[in-house]
Amino acid sequence: MAFDKKLLEIVACPVCKGKLDYDKESQQLICKFDKLAYPITEGIPVLLENRATAIVTE
């Protein structure tokens, strides 16, 4: 099942309540402010802080 991009209008980062961006290649929702990536499983975003992975930038 594909992720419905219309969900981006209503979902928010559970940590900061900010906007999330969809990364189609990695199938994740990205919070640029907190530098966290939330997985999308079978088209459903898993917006649990303990399931997020930190994004490391250099």
UniProtKB/Swiss-Prot annotation:
Coiled coil: none annotated. One of its GO terms (cellular component) is cytosol. Pfam families: Trm112p. Gene3D superfamilies: 2.20.25.10. Belongs to the UPF0434 family. This is UPF0434 protein Sfri_2386. It comes from Shewanella frigidimarina (strain NCIMB 400). The lineage of its organism: Bacteria, Pseudomonadati, Pseudomonadota, Gammaproteobacteria, Alteromonadales.
